């Protein structure tokens, strides 16, 4: 008897190999983004305003990569798509190692942004094909792996940067080579998954793309809006907050320490969530808890004047990040028909990318006009507003939602 994809453990990608790919690519990526502003400003003498444009282009590239990857995943064999994405990323990083002047660095960073969105969406989409584990567990583990990569990368980059920026780019490229080799040998089962999709269409089982029910679509739009708004505010931790802390007399290396704290807590939290997947009654409860923590974290910033209080704010923020961010793509997966899972995983990346692209600009405008304290209140209120919208919406729709496990 012919078994469907996932019924035989040999014809499904093993979760461990998705973890390896996630780790390698995120360690490599974490060699690049922390040093970009410092390298461009201190080494290449690029103004902060131009650096803002460079980072914006990187985020726009990520958005475009996410959209295209989600579109092609649902329509084509994902195996060559992921190979091309990871392989080209390795090539671009080798080119960055050889040519990292101006404006070449800008070009390479924009391309890596596109490929980062492409690869991230494909990894999440590949995860939706796994049937041996609950979606919540898979996305928690992948988010854990992502942040373990960030912890490792950001810890190493500070030491290697003082030694050689070229070496950093070479090591990042080699990590993507590892991810490429891993994909070549271990992602082949996705070919069978794609073949079954094609056979289903040819046999008439799924001749047409399954439309997403209207209620599911509305709920997903609420999640995407929440992601965009949350990232819009969160990105100010990566940009404007460093200036604020330094203005209060807190050394820059203490600000950097907050990100090590952030990633470490995420790793611990994801380990706990993986060990106790039913800690929250439903994915929606997990999302609401996380978004609530985000709102509270910005309120605590109103009163933060020393490192201890900033660390407390970061801990609260990280509890929100560790719970909400992996739960949203998992819930979106449950709400998405099998013929459009890639599309909607791409949409989660796009929503995040929009928030990341415009966050520093939005925060800078509010801070320039009103100051930091009013911005913290604005951020908290807007994030809390997402909860006010989502809870009654979910209560109205949840019994009528169609779930696609």
What residue ranges belong to the model's regions?
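Juxtamembrane intracellular "pre-TM" segments in multi-pass secondary transporters
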Residues: 1-12, 189-225
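Symmetry-related core transmembrane helices of the 12-TM Major Facilitator Superfamily/SLC fold
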Residues: 168-185, 376-392
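Paired small-residue
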Residues: 92, 103-112, 308-316
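Cytoplasmic helix-loop-helix junction between adjacent transmembrane helices
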Residues: 110-146
């Amino acid at each position: 008897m012919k078994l469907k994809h996932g019924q035989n453990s040999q014809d499904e990608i093993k979760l461990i190999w998705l973890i390896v790919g996630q780790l390698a690519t995120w360690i490599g990526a974490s060699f690049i983004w922390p040093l970009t502003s410092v390298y461009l400003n201190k080494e290449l003498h690029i103004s902060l305003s131009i650096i803002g444009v460079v980072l914006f282009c990187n985020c726009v590239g990520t958005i475009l990569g996410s959209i295209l990857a989600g579109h092609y995943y649902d329509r084509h064999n994902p195996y060559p798509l992921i190979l091309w994405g990871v392989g080209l990323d390795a090539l671009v990083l080798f080119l960055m190692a050889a040519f990292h002047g101006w404006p070449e660095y800008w070009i390479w960073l924009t391309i890596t942004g596109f490929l980062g969105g492409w690869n991230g969406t494909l990894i999440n989409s590949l995860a939706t094909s796994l049937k041996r584990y609950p979606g919540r567990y898979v996305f928690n583990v992948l988010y854990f792996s992502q942040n373990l990569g960030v912890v490792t990368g950001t810890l190493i980059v500070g030491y290697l940067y003082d030694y050689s920026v070229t070496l950093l780019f070479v090591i990042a490229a080699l990590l993507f080579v590892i991810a490429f080799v891993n994909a070549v040998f271990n992602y082949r089962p996705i070919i069978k998954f794609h073949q079954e999709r094609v056979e289903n269409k040819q046999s008439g089982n799924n001749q047409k793309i399954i439309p997403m029910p209207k209620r599911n679509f509305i709920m997903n739009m609420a999640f995407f809006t929440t992601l965009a708004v949350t990232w819009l505010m969160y990105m100010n931790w990566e940009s404007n907050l460093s200036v604020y802390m330094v203005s209060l007399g807190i050394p820059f290396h203490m600000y950097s320490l907050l990100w090590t704290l952030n990633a470490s807590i995420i790793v611990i939290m994801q380990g706990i969530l993986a060990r106790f997947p039913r800690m929250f009654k439903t994915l929606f409860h997990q999302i609401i808890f996380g978004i609530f923590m985000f709102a509270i974290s910005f309120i605590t910033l109103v009163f933060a004047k020393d490192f201890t209080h900033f660390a407390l704010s970061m801990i609260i923020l990280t509890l929100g990040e560790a719970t909400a961010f992996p739960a949203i793509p998992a819930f979106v997966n449950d709400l998405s028909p099998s013929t459009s899972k890639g599309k909607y995983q791409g949409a989660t990346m796009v929503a995040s990318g929009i928030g990341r692209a415009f966050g520093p600009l939005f925060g800078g405008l509010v801070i320039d006009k009103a100051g930091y304290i009013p911005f913290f209140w604005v951020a908290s209120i807007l994030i809390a507003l997402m909860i006010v919208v989502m809870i009654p919406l979910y209560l109205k729709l949840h019994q009528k939602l169609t779930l696609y496990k």
